[in-house]
Amino acid sequence: MKRDLELIRKILLWAEQNCDGRHDIMAPFIHIAGATPIEIDFQLRLLRDEKLIVYEGRKLKPVTRWVHFTRLTSKGYDLLHALKNDSI
């Protein structure tokens, strides 16, 4: 699978509207037309690798299948702002 900046943009927009920093979010909860939960999860892994999303919930089991996150980081908001302004 490849990095998909358009899908990443849609995920960040979704997160901006739906994440409150308290609730656990995973790919199956994010509904984006034309994207499967597996495709969304892959992009979430990339966002997590770059510290653009963060998980601040309960401790997860090491074998957790999906990426969990609770909010965007400041870096995540910076990227979202840049993507909204087409400066990337």
Predicted regions, residues:
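Short amphipathic alpha-helical interaction segments
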Residues: 33-54, 66-67
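Short loop/turn motifs at secondary-structure junctions and domain boundaries
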Residues: 60-63
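Beta-hairpin "wing" of winged helix-turn-helix
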Residues: 56-58
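Residue-level detector of well-ordered alpha-helical segments, enriched
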Residues: 3, 7, 39-43, 68, ...
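Generic structural signal for hydrophobic core residues of well-folded globular domains
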Residues: 15-18, 47, 80-83
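Short amphipathic alpha-helical interface segments
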Residues: 2-32
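Short, amphipathic alpha-helical interaction segments positioned at domain boundaries
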Residues: 65-88
